[in-house]
Structure formats: structure tokens, C-alpha cells
Amino acid sequence: MTNSFTEIYTLKNAKPSKSSPSSISPEQYKKNYIDALSFYQNGEYDKAVTLFSKLVQTDSSNDLADNSQYWLAECYYTMKNYKRAVSEFTKVFSFPATDKDDDAQLKLGHCYRSMGNIKKAIEEYQRLVDYFPGSEFYNKALESIKQLNI
């Protein structure tokens, strides 16, 4: 899974990418994104949720929008609001060429497992195995399926 500290370091050292016109500049989007990740890292999940939500709504075509959506879902997951996390992780798949799809898929399985819906958790883990065979989470999904089938 993505390490939020590594992500902040990478972003701070990267040049801003061009994005479609929005109410904030790509530089401001990136700054707000880093601020939201910092809130997440510091356990200020409500602030992170607010900022990540605004980012996704402000410019869903920004290069960091899929990451914003993923971390929004991650906030809800960390707060143990699994039902909302499922809804937010599912939205990650609506972003073309996202690099967060396998992360989100794994987390969907974790959400259902945490809610006690073992059948659905197995389905979500199996989906990761089927659709993301090259994922770094492939073995983790297989292991989760094995554990839940006992």
C-alpha cells in the first residue's frame, strides 16, 4: 500500500503537472493535497476528509484527484466507518489510469471483512486476484481468501 510519508516527499520534489482548468491552480491543488495527507498522518481525519473531499470536487481531472479519492476512503477506513469507506474506495475506479485501483480493491475486501460480510470480502479479494495479477497485493489477497475459507 502507498506510504503517505513517501508520497509527500515525492510530491514536494516533483514539478507540478499540467491539469485542466479549475478554480485552483495545479500548484495550489498539490499544496492542499499535501496538507490533507499531513492531516491524515497526524490523525486529524475530519480535517483530512474535508480537504480531500474539496479536492475531488474542485478538479476531478487533476493528476492527484484519484489519490485524493483514495485517501478520502482511507480516512473513513481508519475511522472504522467501513460502509462509507466502501462507497469511497469504489469511486477510485472511476478515475481513468489510476494507480490506486489495486490498493482500493484490497481495501474493499478489508472493509467487508471488518463488517463481518465474509462472502463479500472473499469476492473482493478474488476480484483483485482476477483483475490485478501483477499487483503487489496479489499474495495478500490470496492469503486473505485462504484465511476466510477456513
Question: Where in the sequence are the language-model features?
Answer:
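Short solvent-exposed coil/turn linkers within tandem alpha-helical repeat scaffolds
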Residues: T58-L64, F93-K100, V129-N139
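Acidic, proline-/serine-/threonine-rich low-complexity intrinsically disordered segments
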Residues: M1-D35, F39-N42, T58
